[in-house]
Structure formats: structure tokens, C-alpha cells
Amino acid sequence: MAATMVLDPKPSSTPPPTLPNPYTTDSQSTDSEDDLYTRLKTLDRQIEFIDIQEEYVKDELKNLKREQLRSQEEVKRIQSVPLVIGQFMEMIDQNNGIVGSTTGSNYYVRILSTINRELLKPSASVALHRHSNALVDVLPPEADSSISLLSQSEKPDVTYNDIGGCDIQKQEIREAVELPLTHHELYKQIGIDPPRGVLLYGPPGTGKTMLAKAVANHTTAAFIRVVGSEFVQKYLGEGPRMVRDVFRLAKENAPAIIFIDEVDAIATARFDAQTGADREVQRILMELLNQMDGFDQTVNVKVIMATNRADTLDPALLRPGRLDRKIEFPLPDRRQKRLVFQVCTAKMNLSDEVDLEDYVSRPDKISAAEITAICQEAGMHAVRKNRYVILPKDFEKGYRTNVKKPDTDFDFYK
């Protein structure tokens, strides 16, 4: 009996296995390779562009360096020629400004691009091109001024012991000048302001300038020495500017002492001036008065003035608040003459026969400078005679030479 075949009427739920499509995989791989290739080409183009930019920057840098060298050479060439000294007045913009020349004229000028604009302040000293008046350099504050500080090596070696007599004058000037600078707290505790200025006055040769030299030697403060006639300059405005420079320099180096010798050259009593020179001197005096009693007064700057003609000075200068202390240097009396003779002959090789008291007791009115000249002339007379010892006749010769003058001498002073 043949076997019968039974067919399952329900189909199987498991799907037949399928094979991967080789065409689909190749297409995706090709797309990925195309993307990578495109990115590679893009990066290559970017690298090439960056290389081109780098070469351009290098070339531009070389050009700028050459331009910089040419500009530096041009600046050196401009600054190498003689320049005109001027004064900066006002900044208009970053490239232009107004300057004043020494002739009194003001100019609207171009400012060199290499100049530091922060240095361009009013009243600053500048250098101008001689032809175009362009501002090419800024000078140091004291470059065009004859005023300068005395360094430690330049300070005189005069001490208080080298000045015979003048004990009262020494004490007064030390109280008015040295003590406020070294012990200012003493004045604060007492509740007073120290003197601002000191006037030394008296006949010629009585030790005014020498005492100021001793002050300069004994103090550590900056010392500025100027003669009154130095403020009188050729062009208008130069004198008052020098006065401002002196006080500015003193304030920058405070504590400082300003010594103005022969102050009567600029501080005579004011009058109705008829000439430009007289008006300029009066402007110098007014600037001096303002600097000594201005709004920006500082206690660390002391002023010493010396003159032979205190009677001609302007009353505004002599008032308290400017010159608080006035120290007189009279002709030496008998005791003062003895001290001056002792100081002058301390290092001299005198004979035992020399009696200095004889010259001290003589009634002639002589100054300390004349006593120094007597001792010097006595030494010169001994040298002329080839002697190493000074005899009484040498002193007598020196005394007659400097004191016993004929009445006909120096008639032009009368």
C-alpha cells in the first residue's frame, strides 16, 4: 500500500534567509570615498591659500621693514641738521600743534609721528626744523636752561669754621634754612610755619656769598645757584620762563635751596617803565614774587637772596611771607676782625714777630674780604723776596696796599 503524503496547510512563520545586496554596499563606499576626497581637495586648497597668504605677509613685512629703515634714516637726517629751540603751547590734534619760537612768534606746525604725545605738555621745550618749523623732538626740561643743580662734587668745600666771626648770622641762617629742612616736625609741634626766604644784605666783602657756600656744603638738600643778571635775556618772556624753570627744578628735587646772588639786578623797586627792557625786568620781578608766594607753595624749597643794596629792593619782595628773615652783615668790629685774621692766618707760616693784634686794633673800617686780601698780599710779598716765613713788614706792605690807598685812587666811584 502506497504511503500517502500529507501536506501541512499552514505556511511556516520563519522567512527564508536572504543574501546581502552587493550593489548597495558598493554605492555607499563610493559615496564615503567621494566625501573624503572632496574634503582632502578642500584642505589642499586651504593650505595652498594659507601658503600664499604667508608669502604675502612675509613680503609685506619686508616692505614695512624697508619703509621703517627709510623713515628712521629720514628722522635722523632731519634731526642731524641744526634745529630751532621752541616752546610747545597747545595740541590741536594728533598731528598738529601750536609752538612758540625764541623770536616771539607762534606757529601752527606738524608734529612728527615718532614723537611721544604724552611728552607734549604746555611750556615743554621742543626742537623745530629750521625750514618747515615742524616739531621733530622733545627736549629734556632743563636742556635749554643755564640753571642746573650743584652735584656733590661741585658743591663748595667752605665750612662754617672757615668763616671768621659772623656767629649771629650763622645761627640765624641755620635756623631759617637748615633746621626747617632737617627737623620740620619741630615747627609743626610749635604750630608755626618756617621762614620761606632769607635776605642777606650788607656792604661788599662781609661774607654773604661765603656763608651761602657753607650752607650748600653742610646740607644734603639740592642746591641751585643763580645770579640775578642771568634772568635778563635778549628776548621777551625768556626771563620769567627761567624763573619758572628754577622753581620747577627745585620742586622736582625737593628738599632744595635756591640761592640768588645780586638779586638787586632784577628786584629793584618798580616804577613807570618807559623802555621795553625795564618792563621786562619788572615782569621778571612779578614772576619771582608769584613763585615765592603762589598757590603751589611748598615748604621744602628755601630761597636765599644776597645783595649789597637792600634799600633799592621792591617792598613787595621784602614783606613777611616772602623774605621772612633779613640778616644784616655789617663791617666787622674789633672782635670780628680778630676772628677773621685768625682764620686767614691759620695755615700761614708766620714769624714770631708778627703781632696780629696790632692790625686788629687799628681804627680803619675794613671788611672780611679786605682782611683776606691783606694776608694774601703779605704772603705774595714774602714769595717775591724768596722767603718761606712771613715777616711783620710783609703784613705792613699788604695792609698799606689794601687799606691805605691814596685819595686820588678810584675817583670814578665818586
From Swiss-Prot:
Domain of life (superkingdom): Eukaryota
Induction line: Down-regulated in response to mixed metal ion contamination (cadmium, copper, lead and zinc), but not in response to zinc ion contamination.
Major localization class: cytoplasm
Binding residues annotated for ATP, in chain numbering: G202, P203, P204, G205, T206, G207, K208, T209
Name assigned to this protein: 26S proteasome regulatory subunit 6B homolog
InterPro entries with a match to the protein in the record: 26S_Proteasome_ATPase, AAA+_ATPase, AAA_lid_3, ATPase_AAA_core, ATPase_AAA_CS, NA-bd_OB-fold, P-loop_NTPase, Prot_ATP_ID_OB_2nd
Biological source species: Helianthus annuus (Common sunflower)
Assigned protein family: Belongs to the AAA ATPase family.
GO MF annotations, alphabetized: ATP binding; ATP hydrolysis activity
Keywords annotated in UniProt: ATP-binding, Coiled coil, Cytoplasm, Nucleotide-binding, Nucleus, Proteasome
Coiled-coil region list: 55-81
Pfam families: AAA, AAA_lid_3, Prot_ATP_ID_OB_C
GO CC terms: cytoplasm; nucleus; proteasome complex
Renumbered residue ranges of the record's region Disordered: 1-33
Chain intervals with Low complexity compositional bias: 21-30
Keyword flag Transcription regulation: no
Cell location: Cytoplasm; Nucleus
Free-text function comment from the UniProt entry: The 26S proteasome is involved in the ATP-dependent degradation of ubiquitinated proteins. The regulatory (or ATPase) complex confers ATP dependency and substrate specificity to the 26S complex.
SMART domains: AAA (SM00382)
Protein's UniProt keywords contain Nucleotide-binding: yes
